[in-house]
């Protein structure tokens, strides 16, 4: 009996040890080699075929933050990894960097299709969101320290991510982009080019722009990421008017009076840069004489994200704080918008919303006003 019991215990011990080793091996295999750019597959639903690359620093923090860094047209994850300061800053502050890569020819991002511009719609935005949730799960990341940034087409996608998945991000920085929904394709084309938007001809009010962003996640009432918007006055790819329209959009989302900012600071953060603050959640930075795109200000990003600031003992080298990226925006078929008609009961007041994807309120305006189509997400009584 004693011999049998001893044999049973030995067998049980070996079984549990091997089972534990197999489980540990699976967990380890899901993680990547620290200190180099690595591709990740199997991160979740990925209908658009977007590629995921990740940089895990050797100096990984406990419960690390995450920065999603999104490349420009013609760019790649590798190009943005080498051409931006985020991997260097990750070693300093211990956060993980996700570098998505566009699946399309020319590698612009899909910021035009209904799928991409809708929460859980299955486009590029959904794939990137799934990269974030995978990384949170694998590395026990701090969900209060997840951020998104990008340049040019990546800046457009940054605005889209902030609108479609506001629950995932605490803050965003946008380098030379356009507002969320500005590139919308009436033909539902993925990765479409919109010349009207690019040239700054799509002009609207904060209420309309804000409604467009909000309707990308209809019914959402939680917190939204703080937005920092950069643009250059000499941008001839995505014209400077897009700076004002993007700032209008987020002023509308946060309920700020766009025409009455709290402060305007000249020569901040650099000479010929003007910083405008509408409130704690929105800051615009307009760079006079700067083209496409505004150089990445890594140190300012770290302050905006909360990795550095007053009381921080860390210092950032100049080489890791401001980085110029070469971005090329390829021209594709221009898509125009067309009006839609819906029927419902009730009456919307002047300036009120009267239509849009996911809208369940009144679609008839009070006497004297017309329900005016802006895009698929927003119509307004004007």
Swiss-Prot record:
Homology family: Belongs to the carbohydrate esterase 1 (CE1) family. AxeA subfamily.
Biological source species: Talaromyces purpureogenus (Soft rot fungus)
Region (Ser/Thr-rich linker): 308-345
Keywords: Carbohydrate metabolism, Cellulose degradation, Cleavage on pair of basic residues, Glycoprotein, Hydrolase, Polysaccharide degradation, Secreted, Serine esterase, Signal
pH effects: Optimum pH is 5.3.
Gene (name only): axeA
Start and end residues of each stretch annotated as Disordered: 313-346
Chain ranges of the CBM1 domain: 346-382
Name this polypeptide is given: Acetylxylan esterase A
Top-level EC class as recorded in UniProt: hydrolase
Catalytic residues identified in the record: 152
Thermal properties of activity per the entry: Optimum temperature is 50 degrees Celsius.
InterPro entries: AB_hydrolase_fold, Cellulose-bd_dom_fun, Esterase_phb, Plant_Biomass_Hydrol_Est
Assembly: Monomer.
Post-translational modification: Glycosylated.
